[in-house]
């Protein structure tokens, strides 16, 4: 399980806004259906996606997260995978610039 507070901050500020409505004020929602996890544990931070408070709460209320995302026509797992890859490239570039 990846824990990365810097990545969670990146998810909140990267400019895409809520994946459902586009609002800029977002929480980092951990996708529960992205990987197998132990009871009561969050998935790794690499599975965090931006959701406004309203949609974050609504997603948790449904209990059927995969269905909730499908209802909104969003492939949140693909988004999380791509965003985490972009973040990795971004942080690698920052580290290289610091070394120069």
Regions found by a protein language model. Give the residues of each.
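Short, solvent-exposed loop/turn segments at secondary-structure junctions
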Residues: 34-36
